[in-house]
Amino acid sequence: MANQFTDQEEIKCSFCGKTQDQVKKMIAGNGVYICNECVDLSKKIIDDELRADSVKTAIELPKPMEIKKQLDQYVIGQNRAKKVLSVAVYNHYKRISQMDFDSSTELQKSNIAMIGPTGSGKTYLAQTLARILNVPFAIADATTLTEAGYVGEDVENILLKLLQNADYDLERAQRGIIYIDEIDKISKKSENVSITRDVSGEGVQQSLLKILEGTIASVPPQGGRKHPQQEMIKIDTTNILFIVGGAFDGIEQIVKNRLGKKTIGFGAENDVDKIDADDWTRHLTTADLVKFGMIPEFIGRIPIITTLDNLSSEDLVRVLTEPKNALVKQYKKLLSLDGVDLKFTDGALKAIADLAIQRNMGARGLRTIIENSIMDIMYKTPSEKDIEAVEVTKDVIIRHAEPKVIRKKDKKESSKARVGANDN
C-alpha cells in the first residue's frame, strides 16, 4: 500500500528516481515502485495516444464532399438530400471519434428523417451510405412493429438484425446504421385522445424513443418472444445512427393549409397555389410532422429532416443507365455471360421510365418492368447458342411485342448476300 514501507532502505520511484519524501504517494509493486507523478505522466501519455488514434480515425472518415461524390456514383438526383445525409453521417461518426477523449462538450446524435414518395431512393440512399462507410446496416419495416406485450415485432428485434448483420460483433454493431422504413405508418390514428390503446401507432413511437436517443437495450439473441428464458445481449444504442423514412402522404396539404392561413385577410395575396409539386418541401416544419401524427418526443430525437423529390422520366432513364450498378448494365452483363449482346433503344428506356411513373412506383418499379419484358429471352438464351444479340424496343415495353433477336446464321446469310451483290 502507498506510503507504508520500512526504514531499512530508501524507497525510490523505479521510473523517475524520486524518493518517497519528494512525492505525495508511492505505490509498491512486485519489486518496483511508482510515484503519483509518474502515474499522472503515464496517464497523459496514454490519453495522448488515444487522442492521436481518434484523430487518425476522424481523418480517415470521408469528408462530406467525398461522401456525396460517392453517392453520386450510385444515386441519381436528390442532390439536396445527398448533401444533408453526407453532412449528418460525417458529423455523427466524427462525434463518436471525439467522445473517448473529449467530454467538454456533449454532442447530440444526428438521427435523420427522409420524407419522399415511393421509389424516390430513400432505402437505397441509406444502404449506399452504410456501404461507403463500411459499417453494419439493417432495415426494419415500421408497419411490423408493435408495442411490447402485443402481437407483432418488438423494437428490440431491430437491434438484433443489426447485430446479426455485424456477425455478432457487438462493437461494430454499436456503430452501425439502422434504417426504419414506412415510419409514417406509425403516426397517431387521431389527434384526439382515445381511450383505446394505439399499439401500432403512438405506442410504437413511444417504444422507439429510448433506442433513438441512446440506451442499453436488452436484445434476445433468438429474437421474438418464444424463448422467454434466453439470456439477453446488452446493446448500447448511443452511437447507432438511426435513419427513418416514409412517404407521408397528405403532409403536402398540411403544409399548404398552414401557409394558406398566414395569407388569409382582406387584400392578402394567396401564394399557396403557386407552390409546385416539390417546392412545398422547403416550407416543411416539425410542427407539420406533429400535425401528421408523429409525437413531439419522437420528432425531437430526429433533429435532421430532409426531403426527396419525385423522380422525373428523365431521372429514371438516368437511373437505368448511369450508376455503377445501373439495371441496364446489370442485365447486359447477365446476358453477355451467355454470349448475347443486349441492347435497349432510347424509346424503350423512355417507355420503361414512363411506365414506372404511371404505376406510381418510381425507381423501385424499374426492375420489375425490365424483368417482365425480357423474361422469355433470359429463358431461351442459355439453351439457344445461336442467339448473338437482342434488341428491346418501345413496342416490347408497351405492347409486349417480341424483342428483336439476331442470330449468328442470320448474320452469316446477310454477309453472303452482300458479297453476292458485290460480285454482280
UniProtKB/Swiss-Prot annotation:
Coiled coil: none
Organism listed in the record: Lactobacillus helveticus (strain DPC 4571)
BP GO annotations: cell division; proteolysis involved in protein catabolic process
Subunit and partners: Component of the ClpX-ClpP complex. Forms a hexameric ring that, in the presence of ATP, binds to fourteen ClpP subunits assembled into a disk-like structure with a central cavity, resembling the structure of eukaryotic proteasomes.
Family: Belongs to the ClpX chaperone family.
Cysteine disulfide links: none
CDD domains: RecA-like_ClpX
Record-listed ATP binding positions: P117, T118, G119, S120, G121, K122, T123, Y124
SUPFAM superfamilies, alphabetized: Glucocorticoid receptor-like (DNA-binding domain) (SSF57716), P-loop containing nucleoside triphosphate hydrolases (SSF52540)
Domain spans labelled ClpX-type ZB: 1-54
GO terms under cellular component: HslUV protease complex
Keywords for the protein's UniProt record, in alphabetical order: ATP-binding, Chaperone, Metal-binding, Nucleotide-binding, Zinc
Biological role stated in the UniProt entry: ATP-dependent specificity component of the Clp protease. It directs the protease to specific substrates. Can perform chaperone functions in the absence of ClpP.
InterPro entries: AAA+_ATPase, ATP-dep_Clp_protease_ClpX, ATPase_AAA_core, Clp_ATPase_C, Clp_protease_ATP-bd_su_ClpX, ClpX_bact, P-loop_NTPase, Znf_CppX_C4
Superkingdom, natural source: Bacteria
Residues annotated as binding Zn(2+): C13, C16, C35, C38
GO molecular function: ATP binding; ATP hydrolysis activity; ATP-dependent protein folding chaperone; protein dimerization activity; unfolded protein binding; zinc ion binding
SMART domains per the UniProt record, alphabetical: AAA (SM00382), ClpB_D2-small (SM01086), zf-C4_ClpX (SM00994)
The protein's name: ATP-dependent Clp protease ATP-binding subunit ClpX
